[in-house]
Amino acid sequence: KLWRMTGTWLGGFCHSIIQIPVIIQLPFCGPNVIDHYFRDLQPLFKLACTDTFMEGVIVLAFSGLFSVFSFLILVSSYIVILVNLRN
């Protein structure tokens, strides 16, 4: 059970570590006010003084990869449960 918790924490850590270099390289200028408290990347992209299309694509691609990976782990665990119930 500890490996599941560790895997979840490591997955979240890796997801964040991948997004940090994307945000650090953005040039920010002008008003620096975000009107909510959520830790989202889209409001930061709006504050950037450059075109953030490619950064958005990178973040979307990695988020999609992690979502698909999590879904596959979930489906595989259900398959194991169903196989064990059948036997």
Curated annotation (Swiss-Prot):
It is a multi-pass membrane protein. GO terms for molecular function: G protein-coupled receptor activity. It comes from the Eukaryota. Residues 30-55 are extracellular. It is found in: Cell membrane. Keywords: Cell membrane, G-protein coupled receptor, Membrane, Olfaction, Receptor, Sensory transduction, Transducer, Transmembrane, Transmembrane helix. Its main location: membrane. The chain crosses the membrane at residues 9-29, 56-76. GO terms for cellular component: plasma membrane. Residues 1-8, 77-87 are cytoplasmic. The keyword Oxidoreductase does not apply. One of its GO terms (biological process) is sensory perception of smell. InterPro entries: Olfactory_Receptors. Belongs to the G-protein coupled receptor 1 family. Odorant receptor. PANTHER family: OLFACTORY RECEPTOR (PTHR48002). This is Olfactory receptor-like protein HbT2. It comes from Apis mellifera ligustica (Common honeybee).
